[in-house]
């Protein structure tokens, strides 16, 4: 993880740690001019590691975004932001996206009253995300909510910290995406691969 954040910069979905500027001697040796391919590859890797996706999963999302109406890059980011594991992370119910994925796969999370154990589930507007009634599930979420930094919640989500309930209000607006990334470079990377 730390090699990744040193190379690619801050990845809040992967870890809360931040790279120290100028501390990596390898990057100082490689400080020559970056090729266009390397710039596109780094943007793609940033996106992949932030959301915790395999290469195959990301390629699938790029194909879905390419077929949809609108800007492929914006649609891609919307698809990734509306994943259940990412929504849990953005609500503050988990400290990282891998932590949120573990909560989902261990069956602690309900979507609209049903147990959901698929982290890639695409949340829709008016979805209600809650925890199981079991004490262990509530304790896990309570610890995450208490320890998470109180950042401003994106306007497409609302949370009730007393009942451990989150609500998806609408599809995310592009200005609320929590990662500094040029999504067009990711789309370019894949368009040149095929």
Curated annotation (Swiss-Prot):
Any one biological process term the GO annotation gives: translation
Family annotation (PROSITE patterns): RIBOSOMAL_S4, S4
Gene3D superfamilies the UniProt entry points to: Ribosomal Protein S4 Delta 41, Chain A, domain 1 (1.10.1050.10), RNA-binding S4 domain (3.10.290.10)
GO molecular function, one term: structural constituent of ribosome
Gene Ontology cellular component terms for the protein in this record: chloroplast; small ribosomal subunit
One Pfam entry name: Ribosomal_S4
Keyword Secreted assigned: no
Coiled-coil region(s): none
Entry keyword set: Chloroplast, Plastid, Ribonucleoprotein, Ribosomal protein, RNA-binding, rRNA-binding
Residue ranges occupied by any S4 RNA-binding domain in the UniProt entry: 82-143
Lineage top rank: taxon: Eukaryota
Subcellular location: Plastid, Chloroplast
Annotated segments matching region Disordered: 13-36
HAMAP family, per the entry: Ribosomal_uS4_B (MF_01306_B)
Function description: One of the primary rRNA binding proteins, it binds directly to 16S rRNA where it nucleates assembly of the body of the 30S subunit. With S5 and S12 plays an important role in translational accuracy.
Family, similarity comment: Belongs to the universal ribosomal protein uS4 family.
Description of how the protein assembles with itself and partners: Part of the 30S ribosomal subunit. Contacts protein S5. The interaction surface between S4 and S5 is involved in control of translational fidelity.
Name listed for the protein in its UniProt record: Small ribosomal subunit protein uS4c
Organism: Moraea spathulata
Gene field: rps4
């Amino acid at each position: 993880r730390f090699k990744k954040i040193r190379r690619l910069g801050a990845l809040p979905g992967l870890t809360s740690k931040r790279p120290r500027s100028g501390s990596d001697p390898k990057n100082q040796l490689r400080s020559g001019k970056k090729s266009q391919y390397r710039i596109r590859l780094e943007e793609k890797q940033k996106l992949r590691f932030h959301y915790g996706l395999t290469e195959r999963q990301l390629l699938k999302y790029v194909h879905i975004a390419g077929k949809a109406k609108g800007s492929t890059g914006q649609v891609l980011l919307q698809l990734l932001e509306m994943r259940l594991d990412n929504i849990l992370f953005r609500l503050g119910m988990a400290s990282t996206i891998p932590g949120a994925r573990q909560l989902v796969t261990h069956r602690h999370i309900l979507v609209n009253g049903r147990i959901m154990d698929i982290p890639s589930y695409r949340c829709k507007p008016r979805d209600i995300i809650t925890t199981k009634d079991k004490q262990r599930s509530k304790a896990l979420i309570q610890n995450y909510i208490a320890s998470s930094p109180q950042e401003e919640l994106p306007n497409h989500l609302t949370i009730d910290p007393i009942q451990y309930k989150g609500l998806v209000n609408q599809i995310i607006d592009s200005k609320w995406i929590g990662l500094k990334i040029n999504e067009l470079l990711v789309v370019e990377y894949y368009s040149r691969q095929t």
